[in-house]
Swiss-Prot record:
Assigned EC number: 2.1.3.2
Signal sequence interval, chain numbering: none
InterPro entries recorded: Asp/Orn_carbamoyltranf_P-bd (IPR006132), Asp/Orn_carbamoylTrfase (IPR006130), Asp/Orn_carbamoylTrfase_sf (IPR036901), Asp_carbamoyltransf (IPR002082), Asp_carbamoyltransf_Asp/Orn-bd (IPR006131)
One annotated GO biological process: 'de novo' UMP biosynthetic process
The organism of origin for this protein: Pseudomonas paraeruginosa (strain DSM 24068 / PA7)
Name of the gene encoding the protein in the UniProt record: pyrB
Protein's name in the database: Aspartate carbamoyltransferase catalytic subunit
Reactions mediated catalytically: carbamoyl phosphate + L-aspartate = N-carbamoyl-L-aspartate + phosphate + H(+)
Positions bound to L-aspartate: K98, R183, R239
Length: 334
């Protein structure tokens, strides 16, 4: 079903979240609302009974065309804690492996009365395509699409930063590693810019840097890690995505670690209270050494905890936005 050209695809007529495809174009107030809502859901995870009834009677379908243990599991937990029914589609054994198109798969899932799709796909733009073509009553959440976006990872990273560092307006944040292939890097740069971070640094070899980062995201680019890490408050390490690389981008993983790997010595260039983050999975000895990943400044496991709360916030807000839009359209029809 084509989207209304007068309204941004992700928002309803009242500016509420309806789909969550990308952080691009979303206002600061909405990102802050997601963070505030997630903060309130963190308390749910500390209870003996970790459930609230916000999505009772709703069905959330996780459609993962690309493998992911952490993202899929946290989305499942988030939906279950909101009391939704959850279906997780194993694409490798589904009809898509027998030639069924993406649209046909979604139509069949719609026929099962799913209220929301969480989609992960190797093609950039897949989540947007799905949001444009599903029934108007179905919300679509992007669980990662190609190199394009991973908006819930971006927001859980922002929640991690805010809970450890307060507001964003005095911070220096460095994103280090395979920027070229990273949807996480793109989502983080957009979120940091929108939330008012004044100093966003990107550190990578030239071969792993997209063209035009400075103009598009307002970041500072460094090819020397030691220079880029000086006095930063937050270090976000990214893994080398070998599965998306073609030959010639790197001489070797050992050379990458020597020049860009986060060691205890290199971390000392950052502020003494700097935090270390990583979206996972971690390649120890490639982009980060174990002493840092497991050290006192690491908040990597906190990111996983906060990820459940962020996904609870996004699922509940998108479902609420869909319900509001449906009510508005019914009132207009009357």
């Amino acid at each position: 079903m084509p989207t209304d050209a007068k309204r941004p695809l992700q928002l309803n007529d009242q500016g509420q979240l309806r789909h969550f495809i990308s952080l691009d174009g979303l206002p600061r107030e909405l990102l802050t609302e997601i963070l505030d809502t997630a903060d309130s859901f963190l308390e749910v995870g500390a209870r003996a009974v970790k459930k609230v009834p916000l999505l009772r009677g709703k069905t959330v379908c996780n459609v993962f065309f690309e493998n992911s243990t952490r993202t899929r599991t946290t989305f499942e937990l988030a939906a279950q804690r909101l009391s939704a029914d959850v279906i997780s589609l194993n694409v490798s054994t589904s009809s898509t492996s027998k030639g069924e198109t993406l649209t046909d798969t979604l139509r069949n899932l719609e026929a099962m009365a799913a209220d929301m799709f969480v989609v992960r796909h190797s093609d950039s733009g897949a989540a947007h395509f799905i949001a444009e073509h599903v029934s108007p009553n179905v919300a679509v959440i992007n669980g990662g699409d190609g190199r394009h976006a991973h908006p819930t990872q971006g927001m859980l990273d922002m929640l991690t930063i805010r809970r450890h560092k307060g507001n964003f307006e005095q911070l220096s944040v460095a994103i280090v590693g395979d920027i070229l292939h990273s949807r996480v890097a793109r989502s983080n740069m957009l979120a940091l810019k929108t939330l008012g971070c004044p100093d966003i640094r990107v550190i990578a070899p030239r071969t792993l840097l997209p063209v035009g980062l400075e103009e598009q995201y307002g970041v500072r680019v460094f090819t020397n890690a030691d220079e880029g890490l000086k006095d930063v408050d937050v270090v976000i390490m990214l893994r080398l995505q070998r599965e998306r690389m073609q030959g010639g981008l790197l001489p070797s993983e050992g050379e990458f670690f020597r020049l860009y790997g986060l060691t205890e010595k290199r971390l000392k260039l950052a502020r003494p209270d700097a935090i270390v983050m990583h979206p996972g999975p971690i390649n120890r000895g490639v982009e980060i050494e174990s002493a840092v990943a497991d050290g006192a400044q690491s908040v990597i496991l906190n990111q996983v905890t906060y990820g459940i709360a962020i996904r609870m916030a996004v699922l509940s807000m998108a479902m609420s936005g869909q319900n509001t839009q449906r009510q508005l359209e019914q009132e207009d029809a009357e």
